[in-house]
Each structure stands twice: as C-alpha cells, then as structure tokens.
C-alpha cells in the first residue's frame, strides 16, 4: 500500500464508546490510545494517578480515579484488565446493564483481526523484542501500529497508530490470553517457569500452550523462534507452521557471530539465509539476551523486506525501552558517586541476564543490587532460583515483597529469602523505601553501580532517588 494512505480497519458494529477498567495498566493504556486514535470515544478508570493516566488525559481521554458504576455511562463495551476483579462495581454494573465485558486480549485481537499481525511472545524479552521489531519496521518505512508493555524511549509512548496494516503487539502468556490472538507472524523468545498458577503448576501445560499459540498462525504464516532455548527446542519438531530459528548456533537461520561487548555497545555480525548478505550490527543495548532479541527483530524485518541499511540504522538508533537496563544517571552519595540503573526484571532468569550484562559493561565496578520481589506466588515457587541469582550481587539490599494484589503466603518473606542467601556468606540488608537513601549513603563507594530492580513500585523509587538528591 501507499504509506501516505491511512489503513482503515472496519468499525466494530455499533460500538462508539469503549470503557477500560484499569486503564493505567501497561497492557491497557496502549490499546486505549490506539482505539482513541481510530476515532472511538474512550473512557477509563484506575485506582490512582500516574504518569500513564496523565498522558491519556493529555490525549483527550476521560480517566476517572476510583471505580464507580457511574463511570461506565454511555459505554457500548467494557474492557477489563486481568488485574481487575469480577466483583469490581463497574464490571458488575456493566453486566447488569447487559453491556459486553471483554478481556484486554480480546480487544487486542479485534484490533489485529484485519491487520498483518506480528505477535511477540515469550517469558522474557517480549517488551524489548516488540520494541525492536516496531523500530526496525518504522525505520524501513513500513509505518506499523504497535502496542508494547513498556514505554519506547524514542517516542515516549507504548503505543502508536501507524498508517500501514502492520501491527506489532506484545503477546501475554501470564494469563494465557495470547491465545485470543491470530497473528500472521509470531516470535517466541523463550519458555520458562513463571505465572505457573495459570497453568495449574504444570510445566507441560505451559509448553503446549505456547505451541497452541503458534498454531493460531495461518498455514502460510511464519513462526520465528529462539534456538538457544531448551524448551523451544523441545517443541520445535511439533510446530506445524513455516518456522525460522535464530541464535548463536550454527544451524540457526539467523545467527550471531563475532559478538563483542564494549561498554554499553554490542557489536556482532548476523549471518542470514541466502540470498541475504551478512550484516554488521552495533547497538547500545548490552548483554547476550539482547543480542538474541535483536536477532528476532532482524529476522522479522528481513522477512518483511526491510532493506539492509534500514536494519543497521534502526538498531544503531534504538534508544531502548523504559525500565529495561535504563541508565538514569550518576548521583553523589555521602561517600562517593554511583550510576543508577533501573530495570524491570523480576524473574531469576532476568536477574541472571541483567547481572551478566552488568559484568560485561562494568567489569571493574561493584554492583549494589536493590531488589524488590514481585508476588508471593512467584517468590515461593522460584525460591531456590532467586537465592542462586541474587547471591551473585556484590551488595544486596532486599525490599519487602510487592504483593501485586496477592494475599500473603505464610513463611514467604524477603527475610526468609535473605537468611538463605546469608547462609552462603553473602551480606544482605533488608531495606524499606523510607530507609533506602540512608542505607545507600552508608554503602555506596565511589564508582559503584546501583541496580534498582523489580516489577513493582521500585521503578518510581529509582526516579525519586534521582530527583531528591
């Protein structure tokens, strides 16, 4: 199509006004923004003010603070975040009024239905890979729409309505809602144990659900999967769709060779299937895991006909994603200056990948790791893996578990986690938001790097730490 022409998807029947319950969530706000830009009247509600809520209001979207039945007035459909309980007064009122109530993923699937959908799935790396794919397609002139679970730094948003039919989305396995999607192309970055309550504690069920997701592709679609992941290799023979692989292994269709890390700069060569030539890639995102994320995006971009120069340039220009190994700056503490890095990682494997990237970027610096565990269920089910991963920090400051709406589980505490790490002759300090600054003043030496990591409120703490010093 001519990129000067706006791709128009059919309207959703009689739907004019759409209400989002939990509109401030990472998965909700982007969908709301895209629908707003398509001309629908959007309203929403959330529990509190946030930067996301303020941004939505700046676009002209009505956002209410608090959940009340009158908030849904005029709505033709109500979209529910997975974090919202069915007893929510707005959900109850909508059902009584016979207004359709649908999950977030169902609306995302509807947005994708008439587009060329590209869905990025996997336990780790979804947000970064979705951002990379969106950036490379944009650099190549394809002008995609996208909905991402994090803020793309280059545009300061996690969603955009492009002119073309291409639609890049982050596909969420946490509640198995990615099964709503029927994309044309799909990436699976890895399969790891997380959100196991969704899968009744059965890893085989998790594995087969990812396979089912790939089989939502049409017979002429394309699966792009990581050959470095053991669980993907296990399902690979069962994938009954055209498939390309990526990784460091010689048999991968898209292969990285000669990878070097020079500070924040990753440099490597990509070997691609004939007739495509090799590409030398440089981008400012450290770590082996991010080389793999880049490979996935290169595979998608190449298969969609993005020219080589645009791929190379797009990766060079990539400015990253909010809260993914994000350097906030350097700040002075009582005993010296330290760099502050903010990161969303909340799973042991993500901690390991981040620490590995840290050691490659700053091999001579000391890592002061401030970690906020996220969810009691995750902390309980992955207790041993958390102990192993967190023991690799030079100094560990551990915060209380961020509940994320869960009920506390007896015996599952940060103190218990700390005690087991201490049994390995590692120093662990329990800190609160109130005591964090004073503790850092005591601990920090000149040249240290502070890693503020977790999926809860710690991201805002990192921002506040930079502002208030």
Curated annotation (Swiss-Prot):
ATP binds at residues 122-128. Its EC number is 6.3.2.8. It comes from the Bacteria. GO terms for molecular function: ATP binding; UDP-N-acetylmuramate-L-alanine ligase activity. Pathway: Cell wall biogenesis; peptidoglycan biosynthesis. GO terms for cellular component: cytoplasm. It catalyses: UDP-N-acetyl-alpha-D-muramate + L-alanine + ATP = UDP-N-acetyl-alpha-D-muramoyl-L-alanine + ADP + phosphate + H(+). It is found in: Cytoplasm. GO terms for biological process: cell division; cell wall organization; peptidoglycan biosynthetic process; regulation of cell shape. Keywords: ATP-binding, Cell cycle, Cell division, Cell shape, Cell wall biogenesis/degradation, Cytoplasm, Ligase, Nucleotide-binding, Peptidoglycan synthesis. Its main location: cytoplasm. Pfam families: Mur_ligase, Mur_ligase_C, Mur_ligase_M. Cell wall formation. Belongs to the MurCDEF family. This is UDP-N-acetylmuramate--L-alanine ligase.
């Amino acid at each position: 199509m001519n990129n000067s022409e706006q791709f128009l998807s059919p309207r959703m029947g009689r739907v004019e006004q759409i209400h989002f319950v939990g509109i401030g969530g990472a998965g909700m706000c982007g969908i709301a923004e895209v629908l707003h830009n398509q001309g629908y009247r959007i309203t929403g509600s959330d529990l509190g003010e946030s930067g996301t809520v303020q941004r939505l209001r700046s676009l002209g979207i009505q956002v209410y603070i608090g959940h009340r039945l009158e908030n849904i007035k005029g709505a033709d459909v109500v979209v529910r975040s997975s974090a919202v309980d069915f007893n929510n007064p707005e959900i109850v009122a909508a059902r009584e009024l016979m207004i359709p109530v649908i999950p977030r993923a169902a609306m995302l699937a509807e947005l994708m239905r008439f587009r060329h959908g590209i869905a990025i799935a996997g336990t780790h790396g979804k947000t970064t890979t979705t951002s990379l794919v969106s950036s490379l397609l944009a650099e190549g002139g394809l002008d995609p729409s996208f909905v991402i679970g994090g803020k793309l730094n280059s545009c300061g948003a996690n969603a955009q309505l492009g002119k073309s039919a291409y639609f890049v989305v982050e596909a969420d396995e946490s509640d198995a809602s990615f099964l709503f999607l029927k994309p044309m192309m799909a990436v699976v970055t890895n399969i790891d144990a997380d959100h196991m309550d969704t899968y009744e504690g059965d890893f085989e069920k998790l594995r087969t659900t990812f396979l089912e997701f790939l089989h939502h592709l049409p017979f002429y679609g394309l699966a792009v999967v990581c050959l470095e992941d053991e669980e993907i290799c296990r399902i690979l023979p069962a994938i009954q769709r055209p498939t390309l692989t990526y990784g460091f292994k010689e048999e991968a269709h898209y292969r990285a060779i000669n990878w070097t890390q020079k500070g924040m700069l990753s440099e490597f060569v990509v070997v691609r299937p004939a007739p495509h030539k090799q590409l030398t890639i440089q981008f400012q995102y450290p770590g082996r895991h991010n080389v793999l994320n880049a490979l996935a995006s290169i595979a998608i971009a190449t298969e969609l006909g993005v020219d080589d120069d645009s791929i190379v340039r797009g990766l060079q220009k990539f400015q990253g994603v909010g809260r993914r190994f994000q350097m906030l700056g350097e700040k002075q503490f009582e005993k010296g200056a330290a760099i502050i890095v903010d990161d969303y990682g909340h799973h042991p494997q993500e901690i390991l990948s981040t620490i590995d990237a840290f050691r490659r970027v700053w091999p001579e610096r000391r890592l002061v790791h401030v970690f906020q565990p996220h969810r009691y269920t995750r902390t309980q089910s992955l207790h041993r893996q958390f102990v192993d991963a967190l023991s690799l920090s030079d100094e560990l400051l551990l915060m209380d578990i961020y509940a994320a709406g869960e009920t506390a589980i007896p015996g599952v505490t940060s103190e218990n986690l700390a005690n087991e790490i201490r049994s390995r002759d590692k120093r662990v300090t329990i800190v609160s938001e109130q005591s964090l600054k004073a503790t850092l003043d005591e601990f920090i030496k000149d040249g240290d790097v502070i890693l503020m990591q977790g999926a809860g409120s710690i991201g805002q703490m990192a921002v506040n730490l930079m502002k208030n010093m």
